[in-house]
């Protein structure tokens, strides 16, 4: 990793700016959280990592270390008996199929979040 820096955030979860390097993978994160307070916390946390998304489904482009951190933090925020979370690895070699208003996004080789 080339470098990270803490950024100010409106919530208690600090967003991290990371200079993109080649060891990132694309994941789809979908969640169903029963409690409104936990729902807001999970949504705010994932917003710091998303490249796109809508409501309770986000696409995130992260390193294996960041993915481990995300899993650990979400495990703390969720009630594992009542809430559901899916993290699906998306194969970057597959061509995306878009329908309706959907459009593909491109990831730059250098990106500051």
From Swiss-Prot:
Disulfide bonds: none
Protein name: CRISPR-associated endoribonuclease Cas2 2
Function (record text): CRISPR (clustered regularly interspaced short palindromic repeat), is an adaptive immune system that provides protection against mobile genetic elements (viruses, transposable elements and conjugative plasmids). CRISPR clusters contain sequences complementary to antecedent mobile elements and target invading nucleic acids. CRISPR clusters are transcribed and processed into CRISPR RNA (crRNA). Functions as a ssRNA-specific endoribonuclease. Involved in the integration of spacer DNA into the CRISPR cassette.
Keyword Metal-binding: yes
NCBIfam families in the cross-refs: cas2
Keyword field contains Nuclease: yes
EC number: 3.1.-.-
Similarity-based family: Belongs to the CRISPR-associated endoribonuclease Cas2 protein family.
Key words of the record: Antiviral defense, Endonuclease, Hydrolase, Magnesium, Metal-binding, Nuclease
MF-aspect GO terms: metal ion binding; RNA endonuclease activity
Taxonomic superkingdom: Bacteria
Binding site for Mg(2+): 32
Gene behind this protein: cas22
SUPFAM superfamilies linked to this entry: TTP0101/SSO1404-like (SSF143430)
GO biological-process terms attached to the record: defense response to virus; maintenance of CRISPR repeat elements
Enzyme class: hydrolase
């Amino acid at each position: 990793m080339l470098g990270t820096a803490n950024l100010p955030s409106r919530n208690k979860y600090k967003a991290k700016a990371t200079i993109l390097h080649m060891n990132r993978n694309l994941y789809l994160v979908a969640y169903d959280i029963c409690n409104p307070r936990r729902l807001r916390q999970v949504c705010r946390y994932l917003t710091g990592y998303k490249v796109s998304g809508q409501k309770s489904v986000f696409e995130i482009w992260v390193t294996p270390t960041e993915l481990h951190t995300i899993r650990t933090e979400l495990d703390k925020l969720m009630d594992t008996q009542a809430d559901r979370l899916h993290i699906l690895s998306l194969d970057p070699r597959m061509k995306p199929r878009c329908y309706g208003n959907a459009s593909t996004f491109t990831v730059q080789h250098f990106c500051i979040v």
